[in-house]
């Protein structure tokens, strides 16, 4: 195996600490070609699709990408922002918010982001951080609940990149924060902030809050993946923080792909059932998504909304994700600070009051 050439650093640039936020990824453009390229990388990951590679690649290349690329491109085009992909835009704002918060608290820490699929990719960003003098790097997945198909594959990509390095940095990883008090408080603050602006559902009259998490195949639960349990844990803590019961609040799973059974209940059919049952208002919030993206804006805000209204529901609200909300940036700073303990960052724990 050939190792990467190490470039000499000036002494002033060395011995730095870095935080790398990692999210799933996004196409570079809302075009069929860009979307096919992105989906080919995403759906070729054996952590995502656990089917023998040879068989799966035939199915993927011949039957999925030619058709799904065009359909998905139209969906991406419907949510694309002037600045680019919503996920990329919100992730960049999270980086800026965290960077600002840490700076206010006298942290001398580099903060950047990478995408597991698409650009900027994890190997490229690790190399960039090394060139900036980072000898200690914290990998911070933006997935609060651990899953092999999200968190683990992000770490896989980082460790593969490390294999090529002659001079490896020290690495720490954040495995999950599904029950972290600051994360739960940020979720509750986001929901309450939305309700303050748009009115609170009339739960006494039967209105519902639906907490929709990204789905995964049920087989992964049977094989020992903790994702389902951690989603339920987050939902229970959030319901408690909001003062709601399981009658007023439902937990569902979205974005099913293929014909295999996934974690249930499914989001879209649940909203259709609620509309048909006479529920007047349904609010949907996605606690597992730390930034708005195709799955929250288009799938929830458009497709699921239509299912609910066409079934008989009257009022639908898609509550925005955490994005760069002050409470979330403060929580992110608290979680990061806890995992940076013992490294030379020259500061104390960030304070939420530091964020405007």
UniProtKB/Swiss-Prot annotation:
GO terms for cellular component: cytoplasm. Pathway: Porphyrin-containing compound metabolism; protoheme biosynthesis; protoheme from protoporphyrin-IX: step 1/1. It catalyses: heme b + 2 H(+) = protoporphyrin IX + Fe(2+). PROSITE patterns: FERROCHELATASE (PS00534). InterPro entries: Ferrochelatase, Ferrochelatase_AS, Ferrochelatase_C, Ferrochelatase_N. It holds the Pfam family Ferrochelatase. It is found in: Cytoplasm. Fe cation binds at residues 214, 295. Its EC number is 4.98.1.1. One of its GO terms (molecular function) is metal ion binding. It is an enzyme of class 4 (lyase). GO terms for biological process: heme biosynthetic process. Keywords: Cytoplasm, Heme biosynthesis, Iron, Lyase, Metal-binding, Porphyrin biosynthesis. Belongs to the ferrochelatase family. Catalyzes the ferrous insertion into protoporphyrin IX. NCBIfam families: hemH (TIGR00109). This is Ferrochelatase. It comes from Paraburkholderia phymatum (strain DSM 17167 / CIP 108236 / LMG 21445 / STM815). The lineage of its organism: Bacteria, Pseudomonadati, Pseudomonadota, Betaproteobacteria, Burkholderiales. The gene is hemH.
């Amino acid at each position: 195996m050939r190792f990467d050439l190490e470039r000499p650093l000036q002494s002033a640039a060395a011995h730095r600490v870095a935080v790398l936020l990692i999210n799933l990824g996004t196409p570079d453009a809302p075009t069929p070609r860009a979307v096919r390229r992105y989906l080919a990388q995403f759906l070729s990951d054996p952590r995502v699709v656990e089917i023998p590679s040879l068989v799966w690649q035939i199915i993927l290349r011949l039957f999925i990408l030619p058709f799904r690329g065009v359909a998905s491109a139209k969906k991406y085009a419907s949510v694309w922002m002037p600045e680019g992909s919503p996920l990329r835009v919100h992730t960049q704002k999270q980086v800026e918010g965290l960077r600002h918060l840490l700076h206010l608290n006298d942290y001398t820490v580099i903060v950047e982001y990478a995408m597991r699929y698409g650009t900027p990719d994890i190997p490229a960003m690790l190399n960039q951080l090394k060139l900036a003098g980072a000898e200690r790097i914290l990998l911070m997945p933006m997935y609060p609940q651990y899953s092999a198909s999200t968190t683990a594959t992000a770490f896989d990509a980082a460790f593969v990149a490390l294999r090529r390095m002659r001079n490896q940095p020290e690495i720490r990883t954040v495995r999950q924060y599904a029950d972290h008090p600051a994360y739960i408080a940020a979720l509750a603050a986001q929901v309450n902030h939305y309700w303050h602006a748009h009115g609170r559902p009339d739960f006494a009259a039967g209105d519902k809050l639906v907490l929709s998490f990204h789905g995964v195949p049920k087989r992964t639960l049977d094989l020992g993946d903790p994702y389902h349990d951690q989603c339920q844990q987050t939902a229970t803590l959030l319901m408690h923080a909001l003062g709601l019961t399981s009658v007023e609040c439902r937990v569902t799973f979205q974005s099913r792909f293929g014909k295999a059974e996934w974690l249930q209940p499914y989001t879209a059919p649940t909203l259709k059932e609620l509309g048909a049952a006479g529920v007047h208002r349904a609010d949907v919030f996605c606690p597992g998504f730390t930034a708005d993206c195709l799955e929250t804006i288009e799938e929830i805000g458009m497709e699921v909304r239509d299912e609910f209204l066409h079934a008989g529901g009257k009022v639908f609200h898609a509550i925005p994700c955490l994005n760069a909300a002050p409470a979330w940036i403060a929580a992110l700073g608290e979680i990061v600070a806890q995992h940076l303990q013992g490294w030379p960052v020259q500061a104390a724990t960030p304070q939420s009051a530091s964020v405007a």
